[in-house]
């Protein structure tokens, strides 16, 4: 089977995370008799996968006509055209359904029927804060309503967790970008966890609903640790030393900080993730991370986890173990098996 994967050569961080598991498993694809290329040639392909950032310039310029023309050209070169994104679980580019056969998403709602409702702010948690606390965004928007046919095209892909989130990741990414030389992640050397929290998440968004969520966490954690942004070097040094790592929602539910926390063997403190379905499933409540409430986060809750912090050591270990197992491609074929299920689904 011949598969072409189209990405933006500027290698946006999400794009790099999209192709990373393919690159570390590249030789293993021979087991599936799959040939993968990243440049479209004159020949036709069984499947073409298009990363959403492939059209980033056209999306930014609102050049819908050029996007439509490209989709039509690509459709002539393949039996199956698949659009892929790693955006928030509810966000869907509804306008491209008419051009594609399948829509691959790195995270989807646990209940797909949610796609049939207009959600405030295009996220389940922004809908929650709007409805319960009447938080209003300056520029209000709602998620698109999808019909059953459109929902049937949505398939769970893979999130951006299988990638390099170490301190030197930006160097290795640029080596691949400019020299096409791929270097796999180095092992992390752990040091004593002599700091209680790392919570460097202070940031303002142009969405009141998102800011409301983050401010809830800011009020609690600013009493216990510094939350202002610091240099990359200082941040990673702090991460190595920290027992707990705090990662609230941002533009989406899944954040790079989640994977950095798993990699550096912290106990990930994160808002409850049970509302989404994602692969790999890093978010197993009270086993790989410690879920926190979307509201009613209070000092009593915090004092409980601080007082009993030794009870959570296993969560840090399990989160780290569960995260790293997807990188051992010589003994484990998790990504290969998941990729094969996707291929079987779209070709059945």
Regions found by a protein language model. Give the residues of each.
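Catalytic binding pocket for nucleotide-activated donors in carbohydrate/polymer assembly enzymes
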Residues: 229-347
